[in-house]
Amino acid sequence: MQLNNRDLKSIIDNEALAYAMYTVENRAIPNMIDGFKPVQRFVIARALDLARGNKDKFHKLASIAGGVADLGYHHGENSAQDAGALMANTWNNNFPLLDGQGNFGSRTVQKAAASRYIFARVSKNFYNVYKDTEYAPVHQDKEHIPPAFYLPIIPTVLLNGVSGIATGYATYILPHSVSSVKKAVLQALQGKKVTKPKVEFPEFRGEVVEIDGQYEIRGTYKFTSRTQMHITEIPYKYDRETYVSKILDPLENKGFITWDDACGEHGFGFKVKFRKEYSLSDNEEERHAKIMKDFGLIERRSQNITVINEKGKLQVYDNVVDLIKDFVEVRKTYVQKRIDNKIKETESAFRLAFAKAHFIKKVISGEIVVQGKTRKELTEELSKIDMYSSYVDKLVGMNIFHMTSDEAKKLAEEAKAKKEENEYWKTTDVVTEYTKDLEEIK
């Protein structure tokens, strides 16, 4: 075996750099167009395959995750199971793209049941927002069956929140309300000033306040007496177990409080009784500040908007408005592809229906004789007629029993409808069609 003499710098500049960029572009960072990390895209692709023929049927999450390898995902089904469980829950998503059936966790207890016991299917949310799938770009890796990215009409990367860490880069995008993102996309489409979308956490009843580019996520409480209060919401980073172990138990162990659990199906709840060792000011503002601090009711988060762009390259944004503007410009090109394709489709459908209707009339009138001729003879005859030459196989393949006046009339009406549809697509534009897409989002 021949050994190559290489220094450390060469290895770092080549293999290490290649691996670092692989983790950035193919594992940890979401795509700005469809909002998916690769594993999520594979899960959706597998769920879409299973939905063919019956969109309503639920499938075991283990079955969905187990099939991603056949689509070109080679990093193990455990990560696909975890991704699927997160995509289907409602407590962590403003806009779930999978419907879940079974125990997918909650804000109080976040862990989902084992994937063999829970079921999922593609959500109506996906079908309502992801359009033009037939025009989605093919992935450069031939073994990668899903497209390079799907084509939602709003930047779904902003809806549910996403985080990821790769070599040298990290992303942390907060969840935003669907309605505010939709509004911002429409403003960008119309060339208006774009309003920053509202940060909104799913199933959170507290308050989210922006302060100097950061966001404070504030829990809530209310005093039920001078020495007792009821905590009704806690910051989003906590589940029940973590909040109890990090906040309530230490305060109780210090002799400051006693507490009772009042969590239930409607969310968090903790009944707190202050002991005399815990002093509270008579000043309302000071008392509130102490409660918020001591009971961990303030969480601070900031955004780090690092994504993969439509060219498959890393891109960092200073704010979500710039991302939305770029998203709209990219997405408009695919709406134009839809329009161009519809023009061709309807033109072809019109000409075929018209040719069939005309052909039937000629057969009925006796100007074209079908009976007694071989397929080859009829093909040669029709090929010489310009109107029929592009559709010879379809005309020759028509059932002779369907060549009636009623069928000719029906085809003429179909041709008229396709002609009108063709005229519509010729006169519409990207802004009109994109606006219609947005209006369909409820």
Curated annotation (Swiss-Prot):
Q: Which InterPro entries match?
A: DNA_Topoisomerase_II, Topo_IIA-like_dom_sf, Topo_IIA_A/C_ab, Topo_IIA_A_a_sf, Topo_IIA_dom_A, TopoII_euk
Record carries keyword Magnesium: no
Which residues act catalytically here? 117
Q: Which reaction does it catalyse?
A: ATP-dependent breakage, passage and rejoining of double-stranded DNA
Q: Which residues form the Topo IIA-type catalytic domain?
A: 29-438
Gene Ontology terms, cellular component aspect?
protein-containing complex
Keywords attached to this Swiss-Prot or TrEMBL record, sorted alphabetically, are: ATP-binding, DNA-binding, Isomerase, Nucleotide-binding, Topoisomerase
Q: What EC number(s) does its UniProt record assign? A: 5.6.2.2
Span-the-membrane segments of this chain are none
On assembly, the entry states:
Part of the DNA topoisomerase complex made of gp39, gp52 and gp60.
Q: What does this protein do?
A: Medium subunit of the DNA topoisomerase that untwists superhelical DNA. Controls topological states of double-stranded DNA by transient breakage and subsequent rejoining of DNA strands.
Q: What is this protein called?
A: DNA topoisomerase medium subunit
